[in-house]
């Protein structure tokens, strides 16, 4: 880091401490040439995730939309909110770890549907009916038949 006073390229760190609830590090530096001190902040670069909608429109990823969709699907079901939030955290982590700058709504929906299926079957059918845009009762029944076929026999 160049010194802001003399532009020398070398400095030494005199003090480091976390700030902003651990999201950044504040460093006191001293220039090895002019011996003046200055402060720098180091924080993780956040890459914004862009969601590509079915219409082709693009918008920033909003985890609350995923959370609200799952809460709506789980309404009046015995699913604790902390489980839903943990799934949304997991999905968000998967999206950021994908290293893609643009994510389709279809990809997000697939991640949600895979997770919600393991959580609650009724919530899964509710979410799938919206996500897969069931047009009529036959489409709905086909999805139920698939779900029943996948379900292991109970003794």
Swiss-Prot record:
Which residues pair up as cystines? none
Q: Does the record bear Manganese in its keywords?
A: no
Key words, A-Z: ATP-binding, DNA-binding, Metal-binding, Nucleotide-binding, Repressor, Transcription, Transcription regulation, Zinc, Zinc-finger
Q: Where are the zinc fingers (unnamed)?
A: 3-34
Question: Which cofactors?
Answer: Zn(2+)
Xref: Pfam families:
ATP-cone, Zn_ribbon_NrdR
- Cited InterPro entries: ATP-cone_dom (IPR005144), NrdR-like_N (IPR055173), RNR_NrdR-like (IPR003796)
Known NCBIfam families for this protein? Answer: transcriptional regulator NrdR
Q: What is the protein name given in its UniProt record? A: Transcriptional repressor NrdR
The organism encoding this protein is Alkaliphilus metalliredigens (strain QYMF)
Q: What is the lineage of its organism?
A: Bacteria, Bacillati, Bacillota, Clostridia, Peptostreptococcales
What gene, per UniProt, encodes this protein?
Answer: nrdR
